[in-house]
């Protein structure tokens, strides 16, 4: 632990000196956190979770993601990398991006499903990205949620480098609304309320404690298959087409 504390201070000192030599410009500092106790806890808003439950929509953990015991709507995702801007004038660190590579979620309705994998946080745009998978394929680094930074980055070097921040009011981007509506086969009423839904909060906490057994390899989530009834419908359409060709 003393080694981690010393290393963290040396790293910050080195970048501070670099920033000083570069004047007021910020220097990007990328920190791999796969082997640190770095977690992002995603909690669905209670009202949105209740509505999703009534609509028959459920959420399941994939890859590194773990469901919090006793809850169907809270998930922990290991943070694998963060990038900060270090500046000397004024002295400080500001978040640039963060990644939870290897983590994923499956969102499933009674008639369809989609997957979200390899989450990223873009603090320049305040957007959460993920590889979005549907029966049509996978869209890499898709803009899923817009968010508000409720509690800005808090950094401490006491006992080692630690960071914490809180994101709230996560709402679907316009592109994600269209993908959710199509993939989950939502009815018109459900589609109309998508823009108004708060999908919850994300709490990020990083401490200098070591951890093992976390993979930072990209998660390749299985592409959700069309629902059984939709597949049956396509099969019947195919049989009808063949029968018509034979009659002609």
Where do the model's predicted regions map?
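Bacterial N-terminal signal peptides that target proteins for export
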Residues: 2-12
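N-terminal signal peptide c-region/cleavage motif recognized by signal peptidases
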Residues: 21-23
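Sec-dependent N-terminal signal peptides
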Residues: 11-16, 234
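Predominantly extracellular/secreted and cell-surface proteins with exposed
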Residues: 64-149
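Extended amphipathic ligand-handling, pore-lining, and cofactor/metal-binding catalytic surfaces
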Residues: 139-177
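A short, hydrophobic C-terminal helix/tail in secreted or cell-surface proteins
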Residues: 224-243
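N-terminal segment immediately downstream of the Sec signal-peptide cleavage site
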Residues: 26-97, 177, 186-222
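Short, charged juxtamembrane terminal tails flanking transmembrane helices
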Residues: 245-248
């Amino acid at each position: 632990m003393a080694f981690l504390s010393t290393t963290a201070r040396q790293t910050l000192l080195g970048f501070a000196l670099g920033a000083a030599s570069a004047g007021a410009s910020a220097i990007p500092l990328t920190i791999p956190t796969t082997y640190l106790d770095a977690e992002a806890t995603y909690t669905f808003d209670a009202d949105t979770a209740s509505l999703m439950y009534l609509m028959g929509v459920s959420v399941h953990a994939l890859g590194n993601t773990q469901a919090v015991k006793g809850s169907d709507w809270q998930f922990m995702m290991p943070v694998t990398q963060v990038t900060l801007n270090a500046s000397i004038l004024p002295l400080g660190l500001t978040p640039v991006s963060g990644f939870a590579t290897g983590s994923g979620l499956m969102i499933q309705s009674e008639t369809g499903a989609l997957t979200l994998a390899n989450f990223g946080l873009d603090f320049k745009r305040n957007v959460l990205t993920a590889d979005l998978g549907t029966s049509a394929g996978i869209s890499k680094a898709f803009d899923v949620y817009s968010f508000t930074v409720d509690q800005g980055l808090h950094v401490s070097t006491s006992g080692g480098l630690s960071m914490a921040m809180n994101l709230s009011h996560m709402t679907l981007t316009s592109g994600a609304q269209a993908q959710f509506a199509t993939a989950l086969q939502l009815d018109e009423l459900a589609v109309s309320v998508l823009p108004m839904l708060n999908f919850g909060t994300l709490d990020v906490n990083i401490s200098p404690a070591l951890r093992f057994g976390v993979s930072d390899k990209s998660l390749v989530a299985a592409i959700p298959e069309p629902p059984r009834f939709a597949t049956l419908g396509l099969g019947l359409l195919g049989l009808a087409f063949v029968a018509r060709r034979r009659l002609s």
